Amino acid sequence: MEAATEMLRMLADGTRLRLMWLLSEGEHDVTALVAAVGMARPAVSQHLGKLRLAGLVSVRRDGRRALYRARGGHVRRLVTEVLHAAAHRVSGTPEHD
């Protein structure tokens, strides 16, 4: 239960949720993420570090670049479902299974 609470706490931050949305779609390096979220590189790196420690993000090296991605299908589906549920709430579209 504590691990689930920590994961959800990490997603409660708007910047981290946006990063997770991007990383759920595929691998990105820090430069691409900085451009996508419009924040300073150190801030993005700090958020990525927190997401990695929470087990939501994995990183692999490609030469000198670090490539980040959402860690596993469960995490990707969690992010997608949260964003879809929010979209339904905002648009007033009925929920579905």
Label every model-predicted segment:
Residues 47:
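Residues within the DNA-recognition helix of helix-turn-helix
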Residues 1-3, 72-97:
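Amphipathic alpha-helical dimerization/coiled-coil segments
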